[in-house]
Amino acid sequence: MKFTAACILLSATAASAFSPVARFTFSRPTTTSLHAEVTTALIKELREATGAGMMDCKKALTEFDGDIEAAADELRKKGLAKADKKASRIAAEGKIAVASAGGKTVLVEVNCETDFVAKDESFAKFADEAAAAAAAMDGDSVEALMAANGNALEDARAGLVSKIGENIQVRRVATRGSGATTTGAYVHMNRIGVLVEIEGGTEALCTDVAMHVAAMNPAYATQEDVPAADIEKERAFLTAQVEDSGKPADIVAKMVEGRLQKFLAENCLVSQTYVKTNDRTVAKLLEENGAKMIGFTRIAVGEGIEKKVDDFAAEVAAMAGGGKAAPAPKAEEPAAVAPAKADAEDSAEAHKLSVITYP
């Protein structure tokens, strides 16, 4: 039943996309003169209206002598004007891709709508191309990345949207390394990506530490990186927990400081027990390898994006023609964490988005 409904929905969407009645609205009059000049402004306007690639827009305008409406109709017929219709749909699945060049390592998050497309070969190839392009440029601007090389990546994205039929977006770029430091990366199941930057040591060591970060999700790199405001907030929280214990003030103060140190040890990377061996801290691991922590960046697919939760029970009841549906299950929520940990996560803006970069 669900498959049939999906097919009907796809058919309806496709019909509206290619309907001859549907028209795009343009800011300038269309031209009917022969051999009209195809200007950059005209190409830009057609591209913004249809979502098609730059070269496709130019070819269509050239074919129809600058008649922008005729060119738009042609792009629609060819299925190249679909990308903009997908842009408002939620894209919370995807892939984290990694690439290195010139002494730096980058992570790129590319989003799509379903995990099925996230596993598609064409989608994976596009994500890898985006990472390679990001590694070849300066900075971490998504806008600059998409506009590089004559909008090559943006055109590839629009073409992939047209081919696959889902909203696909390059969401963010993270970069580390300057050539004078050592960087490494670890990507877990294409969904969690970590960059680690150290002074001294090897790329393999960076990768091992990155694997630890992926698993343990520390909030900070070192205790020195924890903002003073966050420490005071946690101290106030811990004090409120024990101030009614009836114990003397000096004992309460010692309890608070002890719990605060435990909080810092649990939430700072170098203070955590190294997950692969459980016999030393990350700080000790770095020391044994003659390395010093500079920082890390951790990103995960879809974090910070609100996903649509389908009410399957209500859908079935509606299709059955009535009857009150049973309450739908709640949206999936993260597992409960200790109050101190939850408070720590709320205290850092970067951590709220799970794009953790320290320092």
From Swiss-Prot:
InterPro entries: EF-Ts_dimer_sf (IPR036402), Transl_elong_EFTs/EF1B (IPR001816), Transl_elong_EFTs/EF1B_dimer (IPR014039), Transl_elong_Ts_CS (IPR018101), UBA-like_sf (IPR009060)
Single GO BP term: translational elongation
Region (Disordered): 323-345
Segments of skewed composition (Low complexity): 323-341
GO cellular component: mitochondrion
Keywords per UniProt: Elongation factor, Mitochondrion, Protein biosynthesis
Domain of life: Eukaryota
Subcellular location: Mitochondrion
Main subcellular location of this protein, as a coarse class: mitochondrion
GO molecular-function term, one example from the UniProt record: translation elongation factor activity
Family according to the record: Belongs to the EF-Ts family.
Note: This protein may be expected to contain an N-terminal transit peptide but none has been predicted.
Function: Associates with the EF-Tu.GDP complex and induces the exchange of GDP to GTP. It remains bound to the aminoacyl-tRNA.EF-Tu.GTP complex up to the GTP hydrolysis stage on the ribosome.
Protein's name in the database: Elongation factor Ts 1, mitochondrial
Taxonomic source organism: Thalassiosira pseudonana (Marine diatom)
